Design a protein with these regions (language model features):
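A short, conserved structural fragment
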Residues: 66-79, 228-231, 295, 345-349
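Accessory beta->alpha helical hairpin/"wing" motif in late/C-terminal subdomains of nucleic-acid enzymes
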Residues: 75-115
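Short Lys/Arg-enriched helix C-cap and helix-to-coil transition segments
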Residues: 226-243, 293-309, 348-349
Length: 349
């Protein structure tokens, strides 16, 4: 059952536009932030695989892809895997059986979804124990740095802890009421509070008849859904925003630092000099921000005449290669080409 769910999930990730090697799948799942890996995820619509809960070794990837090929769901041509009509039918059936998957997961939120769950559980524990005047509990999160960040967030809310606990409970209740009973119970069973130890992931899997991967995916998707339930949830929104910032909005630490300079008006050259990096490294950071966080302030980094030429070329030939573009535009930087190519893929030209 565990392996069959994995196979269905991997097959679900494929679309008609997906054509990838096994190694590319592996790198995307690991959350590698190189421009080439991120671009592969974008081009092949594999954003949901980025930093995935699907944790497989190289040999396990080989095994799963072989089994998917044997099932006739995927086909392999020159080392690249593509979904077959049979695979598309299996994907539709899988979504019908697991409708939570019928959603869009952004790469920028991949780490935030995971971290937010832990902050969410810990804040619930803190406020629950406070309500009963208990200071002698074992904290859900043992890391001191994270503990201090959460305590700082609680202090910044501007409410005494007692009314804060009531507000928190009300917001959680309102969110749970939007879910089917089974999913609401799924969350509540894992929560921690005064004299209440939530279930472990293993216990949750047994209780709900799920695989371990299904528990992780369900948790992430519910946290993503929670992040969209903010119109009447000031505390939950504030916590999400704080976690998202602590996760550098999905960027690597180095890319986040470079983008901070660039967004404050620094040039690529100046940013590279200040940070003692190569200019190409800063350009890679820009591509990371565009691909992960959908940063849109990059156009001033492309000479206008070059941008206009590239746009015209892509409109006439959507599959335009860098080599072809170089024949039309002298001294064309790959960085400029890639930025406009991303626009073309996203339908923004």
């Amino acid at each position: 059952m565990t392996e069959m769910f994995e196979l269905n999930y991997i097959n679900y990730l494929f679309s008609e536009k997906t054509s990838v090697t096994l190694r590319q799948m592996e790198l995307i799942a690991e959350g590698k932030r190189t421009p080439s890996t991120l671009f592969t995820a974008e081009k092949n619509q594999l954003q949901a695989l980025f930093l995935s809960s699907l944790s497989l070794s190289k040999s396990e990837w080989v095994d799963r892809m072989k089994k998917l090929s044997d099932l006739g769901w995927l086909t392999q041509e020159e080392g690249r895997y593509q979904i077959t009509p049979s695979g598309q039918q299996s994907k539709k059936a899988f979504i019908l059986n697991y409708p939570l998957l019928n959603c869009t997961l952004e790469m920028s939120d991949a780490l935030t979804r995971k971290e937010f769950w832990h902050w969410f559980i810990f804040v619930t524990q803190i406020l629950s124990e406070f309500s009963y005047g208990n200071k002698g509990y074992i904290p859900y999160i043992s890391d001191r740095l994270t503990q201090n960040r959460i305590k700082k967030w609680l202090a910044e809310q501007g409410f005494p802890q007692k009314p804060l606990a009531v507000m928190w409970a009300d917001e959680i209740k309102a969110f749970l009421e939007t879910l089917p009973d089974e999913l609401g119970t799924f969350i509540v069973n894992q929560m921690i509070g005064h004299n209440y130890e939530g279930m472990t992931k293993r216990q949750t899997a047994e209780k709900h008849g799920m695989t371990s991967l299904e528990v992780l995916l369900t948790t992430e998707i519910l946290m993503d859904r929670l992040s969209r339930f903010f119109e009447e949830s000031d505390l939950l929104k504030s916590l999400w925003d704080t976690v998202h910032k602590s996760c550098h909005y999905g960027l690597s630490d180095s890319a986040y630092r470079s983008m901070t300079f660039l967004m404050n008006g620094s040039s690529i050259h100046s940013t590279a000099a200040i940070r003692k990096l190569k200019e190409n490294t800063v350009k890679e950071h820009v591509l990371e921000a565009v691909l992960i966080s959908k940063y849109t302030g990059y156009k001033p980094l492309i000479p206008k005449e070059v941008y206009d030429q590239l746009r015209k070329l892509f409109l006439s030939e959507p599959s335009l290669s860098y080599a072809q573009a170089q024949q039309e535009i002298q001294q064309l930087e790959f960085f400029w080409y890639r930025l406009v190519e991303i626009e073309r893929i996203r339908g923004c030209l």
